[in-house]
Amino acid sequence: MNGYFKLLLILAVAFALWTYWLKPEQGSRSLELYSPIENVQQVEGYTITSLEPYAGEFRVLARENYRMGREAELSPVDFALGWNEMAKPEVYKQLSITQSNRWYYWRYENNPPIPVNDIASSSANTHLIPANKVVAKKLADIDADDMVYLKGQLVEVKSADGWTWRSSLSRTDTGNGACELMLVEEVREISSL
């Protein structure tokens, strides 16, 4: 039994090393040949189709990194983004904002700081696909509360086995399917709190 325990421990340590230090950077390694001019890209078994350009200045309300799952191969981070009133600290700081399992959640105590419909239609969970390693590094350096400029494409991703991940094309929708899936070509930090 002692030998079995040692083998199990060695395998666990080897997996941890591979996962955290030796595994290639996720979300950037395969897009080095990405060309923003083309509407459709073939990347490591995925077809990435640009649906429409997407750009703007946003407040990062929260961020969540992902290392596991098919989606993490392309999108290693989600930003909960706010614009209009939801970009103002005096508004969003009155909310409890969390992210989990590729969803963004908010709640308030007593009364909402702005109408609930405005909260929902002025914020979104955005799955970010870095177009290259430079963009991936810049996204990794962005923190919650930063004001950022993002530019890229809303996309649909498909694989040969039928799996599909498609961006919402509306800024005012809510619920399942309302997240933006963005291929980020440019990112710039405007300010931080």
Please tell me what each predicted stretch does.
Residues 2-193:
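OB-fold and OB-like single-stranded nucleic-acid-recognition modules
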